[in-house]
Each structure stands twice: as structure tokens, then as C-alpha cells.
Amino acid sequence: MNYRKVFIVVFLFSLFCLGFCFAGFDNYETYAFEQLNEKEQEVYQKISDAVLNCEPIVVDVLVGADANMKVLSAFMDDNPGFFWVESRLRYSLFVDEDGNVRNSIRLYYTHQEDLSFDVERFVNLVSKFHQYIKDDENDWIKLYHIYDYLAKSIKYDNNYMDQSMWSVFFEGIGVCAGFSRSFQYLARQEGIPCLMVHGYERDSSGNIGTVGHVWVMAKINDTWYQFDPTWGLADANGNVDFSFFCRSDAKMGMTHVIRNNYPLPECPSDAFSYAQMRKRYMKVYDESIVVPIIQNAFSRNELTFTLEFENVAELEKARQSLLVEKKVFSLFKQAGFSVSNVLYSTNRQNYSLKISVSKFERL
């Protein structure tokens, strides 16, 4: 392998990845780094140097595998574009030639044999995605495009081991880490601050799971919001779930629990949630509002759409009226459509009602 060529390409790619570094007062590109103590930051820099050169061994690190894993995780949180480094390491002690006991970590890499070629392919592939985003679009629209693109283009495979962006962009397969790193990377290439979030999912009863989960938060107009691109995956008919797009800590906390190694910014608002932006949120259930919601959804080719409510009581009112009393069919007619079959699901955790139709006729 031509290591000189690899180093040059990787170095240029690192500049591409970090193009917005230090481009704002909060330095979001190095957010995780800034949460570390001085010794951890030293190891972070050693890991960075090693990754740029694909060097497997880093010496004189922190004591213990967990302490070093915290730093490696922070490095990967700041640098989603380094798809060739894996999120695992091996810690060990060794005796140097002077008889001193020292420690080290071993890093693991993928795609080493053709890394220069893979990096160039990756940069070219990602640049094509950005052709679909207009420079004059606001950040909410740009994040919508990213969320929608990942939800429709990538399949989730819980058995897939690659947690990087490589599998997402080149193989169309990923897990939550790959989805989130891809979202973060694409957002940052648009100049939008975006951070990784680590934690756990809640089940339908609100119990915290035992398997780790990863999602993101992004900044719009000086306010941070949470996003879970994995939970937005499109169904068999291509309908994307935007319930976890641009959410507050309170709303996302109904289904997610943050367990980060370092503090994250607060996400205080749902003002830019998909439901509020598309006027599908109701403090009090009002069936007259459902008609324009149907018209708006169908105009966007969304045959599955979600109504969101202030609390579980209003959700139950909507479910009773629309589905138990079957008023949903008359509302579709008022909106100008005839449907014969309506599927639905309720989520009492986030007070939402999902309505889906497979076929319709215009009246």
C-alpha cells in the first residue's frame, strides 16, 4: 500500500471533514474534546494523530480500557467522517527497552488496503447528496432533507457490526451509530452544528432498555433540538416517521434516556417539531383541523401522517372520535378523498396518533 498517498488523501479528507472547525464561538466541531480534562485531551490528540496515519498503537495513554474508551468515543463524536476507525480498542501494558512499564491502546481500522480510493469515493458520493440542497434553504429544511434521505435510503440491520458511515453510504445498511454519524456529518457539511447523543431507549411501558442507543442534536437559530434518524426509518410504502425530528428534551425523554460521558446542551423547545411546523399539533382535539391536515399530507404524498396532542386525554378524544366512531372516513371525504381502509396506531408515550391509508380516490 502507498502509505504516502494514503496519508496525503486522509489529511486532505480530514480538512474536508473539519471544514467548519472553530467557525463559531462554541466550537461545536470540537465539543466533545472541550469536555475532557487536560490528560484526556492529550490522549485525544494522540488518537487523532494515529488515525490520520492509520497507526494501530498509541502509547502512554490513560490507565484502564474504560478511561481510554471514553476518549476514543469523544474523538469519534467530534469526527464522524473518519469511517475507517472502529469504535473499539484493546488496552495493554508493556515493558520498553529501558525496563520501564508503560501502557498502550491498540486501535482497529477497516478499509486499510484501499483507503485512499475509498476516501475519494466517499467524498464524491457525499458531495452528490448536497446537490439536492439549495444554499438559500433554511436550516430546518436542510435537516428535513437529511432526515428524509437517510430514512428512505438506508435499511436498519441490528446484526450489522459496522457502526460507521461507510455501511450507510456504500452498502445502504446501518445501525443507530451509523445513521447518527451520517446525519451529523451531512448537517455539518451544511454548516449546521450537530452533536452525537448516547443513551438508551424506553419500551412502551417507559422502562429503560439495556442496549445502548445513539442519536443526535442539532442547532437551529441558536436553539438545540434532538433528532433520532434511526427511529424515522421509512415503512414499506416509503412513509417516514417524523415524530422524532426536532424535539425537546422533554418530548424525546418520553422515549429516550441520555447517558452521555459529558454534558450536552439543553433542548428546551418543540417549536420546530414536524407536527408543529406542518400544523399537525393540537392542544385540544378539533376535528375541523383534521381536514386541512389530510389535504396537506396528501399534497406531500404522505399517505401516512401523524397527529400529535398536548396530553393523553386529548389523544384519547381523537382516537374515540376518528376511529371508534369512524368519523375519519367523513373527514377524508370533506378533504376531497375517498378511502376504504384506514390503519392506525397510537403512541401514549408521546401522545400521537398515526393514520395510514394504502389507496384513495379523489372526489
Q: How does the language model describe each region?
A:
Residues 21-124, 298-299, 313-321, 326-363:
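Linear, non-domain "peripheral" regions
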Residues 109, 113-168:
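Secondary-structure boundary elements
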Residues 1-27, 146, 176-178, 182, ...:
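Gram-positive cell-envelope targeting signals
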Residues 44, 69-72, 119-126, 130, ...:
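Extracytoplasmic/secreted envelope proteins and their assembly/folding machinery
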Residues 109-111, 200, 231, 309-311:
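A mature extracytoplasmic/lumenal domain signature
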Residues 242-363:
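Low-complexity, Gly/Ser/Thr/Pro-rich intrinsically disordered linker/tail segments
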Residues 178-251:
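Hydrophobic/aromatic-rich core segments of domains that either
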Residues 113, 161, 170, 174, ...:
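Conserved active-site-adjacent core of cysteine acyl-enzyme catalytic domains
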